[in-house]
Amino acid sequence: DSDGQLDWYLLDRPENQKLRKFFREINAFYKKTAALWEVDFDWAGFEWLVPDDNHNNVVVFLRRDKKGRDLMCAVNFSPNTYTNYRMGVPPHRRYVPVFNTDDPAYGGDGFGDSEAVMVEAVPSHGKECSAAIRIPTFGAVFLRGEGPFPRPRKKQQAKALEKT
């Protein structure tokens, strides 16, 4: 009814309070995270990591701010949870979780990475490095790339080859 009032009493329900908290916090997250809006109209601000995983109903992409800082977003459109979803990533030392739509504060189960995810020198999706993350059912996780990926020095590479 467009002429009536909103049903304000609905905010008394705990599940609606959690949903309200979710929208408050994701809007604040958007505003404070320049990678989500700063380079909106240029491909330099966006990169597909996993654009075509229709079997798992997952997409993963990066957003970048003007300083080149990466924010990875993995979205699961399926009723399955993924505990070890591997994808190729830019060479950072690690990816740190910064927002999870499955947080219990929003009515979720809290499934996702709570600690930093280390990047490994395991090729995947056309990249020389990859990471394995946890993605919740019908949810999204946002992770910030941190630090340069450690490259082995030439002496270390030579020693490693001698051992084999």
Protein language model regions, located:
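Carbohydrate-interacting/catalytic domains
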Residues: 1-164
